[in-house]
Amino acid sequence: MLSPERLALPDYEYLAQRHVLTYVEDAVCQLLENKEDISQYGIARFFTEYFNSVCQGTHILFREFSFIQATPHNRASFLRAFWRCFRTVGKNGDLLTMREYHCLLQLLCPDFPLELTQKAARIVLMDDAMDCLMSFSDFLFAFQIQFYYSEFLESVAAIYQDLLSGKNPNTVIVPTSSSGQHRHRPSTGEAGTPEGVEASLFYQCLENLCDRHKYSCPPPALVKEVLSNVQRLTFYGFLVALSKHHGINQALGALPDKGDLMHDPAMDEELERLVLRWRPHRSSRQHRAKEPGAFGYQRRDKLEALQTVPPASAPTPCLYQWEPIE
C-alpha cells in the first residue's frame, strides 16, 4: 500500500525519486534484445516478471557495472546479493585477499572495477599490504560504504585534502580523477604536527556537501555522531568509523547487523530444499550405474542434456527477467 507521503509527491518527482524511468528504459532494451524469445510468452508477462525481479532485487545479477550502480536500489540489491551468495565464506571462517574478493564480485558482475575493490580493502587493511587476508565481515561492511556512497566519498576525499592543505573549506568541491580517494593513504603525522583534520570543521564541510548534492549520502545526524566522538581524525579513520557504525548500516538497509550476518533462514531453507531434491536423483543415478547397460543410459542422459543447451550463436537471454515461472 502506498504511504500518504508517496501519494503527496507530484508524479514527476515520484518518478525521479524512484528512478522509474531507468527501469522502464532497461526493460524496453531487454525486450528488444530478446524479442524472439519473449514473443512466445507475451510482452505483458515479460514486464510483470521484470518488475517483480526489480522488487525482489534479483534484476542486478550478472549485469554490467553501469547498470548495477545506476540507482540506490540497484546498489543495495547488489550488496544483498553478494552477502547472500558468499556468506558461507564468513560462516566457514575463511580469510581471503583483496584479489580473491574481487573474483567473487566478478562472478556477479563480470566487469566490476578492480579500483573499487582496492578502495574497500584499503579501509580494512590501512597500513598493511594489499595482499593481506581479510575476514568476510570486515570486507563486506567496508565494501558497503565504499560502493554505496562512492560519489560522496570522492567528494569527501577532496574536502579532506583541501583541509590538510589549508584551503577554504567552503569552496565547492568538484572531485576529479586526480583528487580522488586513491591519493590518500593513512600516514603518521610529522613530529609536532597533529594528525588528520579537526572533526568539527570537517563536519561543517560534510553537512554542506550533503545539502548541495543529490547522490546518496549517509544521514547527516549519524555523520555528526561519528565525528562528535573525536577531536581530530584522518580520512581513512573516518571511513572505518562509517563502516562500523550500526546506525548507518541500518539506515542503508541492505545488510543485517554484524551479529546476524551469517544467518539467512530463507536462503538456508532454499538450499536445504535443493539438497533434498538432489539426493534422490543422485541415488538413482548411482543405482543405475551398477546395472547392465548403464553406460548407454548415461550417454542418453548426456545427449538429452546437450540438446537443452542453446547454440553459441543464440542471444543470451536474461532468464530472471522473461523465463516463465512455473
From Swiss-Prot:
Signal sequence segment: none
Positions of region (Required for interaction with PCM1): 1-111
Subcellular location(s) per record: Cytoplasm, Cytoskeleton, Microtubule organizing center, Centrosome, Centriolar satellite; Cytoplasm, Cytoskeleton
InterPro entries: CSTPP1 (IPR038968)
Region (Required for interaction with TPGS1, LRRC49, and TTLL1) residue spans: 1-225
Function of the protein: Regulator of the tubulin polyglutamylase complex (TPGC) that controls cytoskeletal organization, nuclear shape, and cilium disassembly by balancing microtubule and actin assembly. Regulates the assembly and stability of the TPGC and thereby modulates polyglutamylation of the microtubule, which antagonizes MAP4 binding.
Subunit structure: Interacts with PCM1. Interacts with TTLL1, TPGS1, TPGS2 and LRRC49; the interactions link CSTPP1 to the complex TPGC. Binds to alpha-tubulin.
Protein name: Centriolar satellite-associated tubulin polyglutamylase complex regulator 1
Species annotation: Bos taurus (Bovine)
Lineage, top ranks: Eukaryota, Metazoa, Chordata, Craniata, Vertebrata
